């Protein structure tokens, strides 16, 4: 069985194509969204999702989140004395989703179509694929998030040619894509984005407003108090979309700090973020050679697009109401599930050709002559420019720059800077050329880039026909099949908590967190209910556990209100 997975910065989802069409698969807690949070305790137990999120309130050093931002890098996260790479943490999310899907579907899940941001470069895509492999999933196909959203909205079934812009503002990343449908082909025309802009930034604005109004300083708060502040700011951010003002409260020791924040104040403080949002929109339109008026439809995906401050801004910007038929949190996962069905050649799904673009420019280092006989080295020569539809193959002819030069070195680079040193080095190829006066020998440098992110570099000496090729599959941190297998064995000691224990652990963690926040009689009441629940867990009698859990849940919900 092939499933579709939206591996998000803030939340992740799994979906499958069933007889009823694409459906979101609920996790073991019965919810569609699984927070992309992982916690590992000192005994090697892994907690994923809400349970890990609750542990962050109590054991912040054992929890990692937003690690999608570091995919494809060498960064490691230290959880309870154990080090993990971003793809290893992502694999734990994927394992969790895989288990839930198998229980829901009643069959083994062997493969997944995983969504990635359109601007993810080769390193990040390879890291995502490795995460799937570490989770025991075959990942042959990845789909860009905007394309997945367009598929979910059914735009590929439209009868007429259409241009549309997909606006994806998630918890931690921002992505703008312009797509065009013509003759049953869904083509990505341009992408732009910001890897460090998302709903979390709008939460930070709310947090800063609260600190300003209460005279508090973030650095003076303990780590647990900072976590509580963020949680309260997140709740206020969501609440203010439906109100003209919200009241934030934060218990610090025995003092309850309170501040009222109006919608007008919040909108004014968000102005800088909205201006940052505008830039990728302008860039994507410019790269596609289009104006705002050329866009037929605007689609919203990502949970942060629910914010009224964001939606109002977009209505003013595009002078039209965006399409909001689908749940913005679920559209990408549903599209990935439809793509999985296409891969399986399911007859219920109309086949459509999905094209993607090269997110970053690929080129090489060259020497340029800026005056007669004066040269400057270290310059960047683009060969396949960003937002070129892939698969693509382009050739540049380059010449020798010195008399009696007998070798040409082709350094393969990725980036947008004029200077080679500022771009990402991918590989290098050297080839012999006949000696002669400078400029007398030429080489054809051909880059071929396919939809699976494989880059083939071919260098051909024009005079002799000598040809050399190299294929760039990944970067220095690419793992071999043997290394992946070895790491899977090393990670096998980490056990995701059994499904039937998840709800009990989550309730207990919530209760412990609220106990720490409470005072006086409220704290005593919580202690009494927690003790009863813990006693029921020790006895192991299902009916007693359910009764005690329900009673504890009731007072926890009263506290949350």
Residue ranges and their predicted role:
Residues 1-73, 77-83, 92, 99-561:
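Oxyanion-binding/catalytic loops of NTP- or PPi-dependent enzymes
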């Amino acid at each position: 069985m092939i499933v579709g997975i939206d591996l998000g910065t803030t939340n992740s989802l799994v979906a499958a194509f069933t007889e009823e069409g694409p459906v979101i698969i609920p996790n073991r807690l019965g919810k569609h969204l699984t927070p992309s949070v992982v916690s590992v305790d000192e005994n090697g137990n892994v907690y994923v999702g809400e349970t890990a999120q609750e542990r962050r309130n109590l054991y912040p050093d054992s929890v990692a989140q937003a690690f999608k931002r570091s995919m494809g890098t060498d960064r490691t996260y230290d959880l309870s004395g154990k080090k993990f790479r971003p793809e290893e943490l992502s694999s734990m999310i994927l394992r969790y989703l895989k288990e839930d899907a198998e229980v829901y579907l009643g069959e083994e899940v062997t493969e997944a179509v995983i969504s990635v941001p359109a601007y993810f470069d080769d390193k990040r895509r390879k890291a995502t694929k490795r995460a799937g492999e570490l989770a025991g999933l075959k990942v042959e196909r990845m789909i860009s998030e905007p394309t997945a959203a367009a598929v979910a909205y059914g735009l590929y079934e439209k009868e007429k040619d259409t241009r549309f812009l997909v606006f994806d503002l998630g918890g931690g990343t921002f992505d703008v894509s312009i797509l065009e449908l013509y003759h049953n082909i869904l083509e990505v025309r341009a992408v732009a984005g910001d890897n460090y802009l998302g709903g979390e930034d709008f939460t930070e604005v709310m947090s800063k407003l609260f600190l300003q109004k209460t005279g508090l300083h973030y650095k003076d708060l303990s780590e647990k108090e900072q976590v509580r502040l963020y949680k309260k700011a997140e709740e206020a951010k969501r609440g203010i979309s439906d109100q003209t003002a919200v009241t934030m409260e934060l218990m610090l020791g025995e003092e309850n700090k309170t501040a009222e924040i109006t919608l007008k104040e919040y909108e004014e403080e968000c102005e800088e973020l909205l201006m940052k949002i505008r830039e990728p929109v302008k860039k994507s339109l410019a790269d596609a050679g289009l104006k705002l008026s050329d866009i037929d439809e605007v689609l919203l995906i990502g949970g942060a697009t629910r914010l009224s401050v964001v939606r109002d801004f977009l209505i003013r910007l595009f002078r039209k109401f965006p399409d909001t038929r689908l749940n913005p949190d679920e559209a990408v996962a549903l599209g990935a599930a439809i793509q999985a069905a296409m891969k399986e050649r399911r007859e219920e799904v109309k086949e459509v050709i999905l094209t993607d673009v090269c997110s970053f420019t690929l080129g090489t280092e060259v020497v340029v002559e800026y005056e007669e006989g004066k040269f400057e080295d270290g310059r960047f020569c683009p060969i396949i420019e960003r937002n070129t539809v892939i698969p693509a193959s382009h050739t540049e002819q380059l010449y020798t720059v010195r008399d009696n030069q007998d070798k040409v070195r082709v350094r393969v680079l990725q980036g947008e800077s004029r200077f080679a040193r500022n771009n990402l080095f991918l590989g290098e190829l050297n080839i012999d050329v006949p000696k002669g006066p400078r400029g007398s020998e030429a080489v054809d440098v051909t880059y071929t880039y396919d939809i699976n992110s494989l880059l083939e570099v071919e260098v051909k000496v024009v005079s002799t026909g000598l040809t050399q090729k190299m294929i760039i599959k990944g970067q220095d941190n690419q793992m071999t099949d043997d290394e992946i297998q070895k790491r899977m064995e090393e990670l096998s000691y980490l056990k995701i908590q059994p499904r039937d224990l998840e709800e009990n652990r989550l309730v207990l963690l919530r209760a412990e967190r609220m106990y720490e926040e409470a005072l006086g009689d409220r704290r005593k009441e919580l202690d009494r209910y927690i003790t009863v629940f813990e006693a029921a867990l020790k006895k192991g009698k299902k009916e007693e556990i359910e009764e005690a859990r329900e009673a504890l849940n009731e007072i926890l919900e009263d506290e949350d209100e």
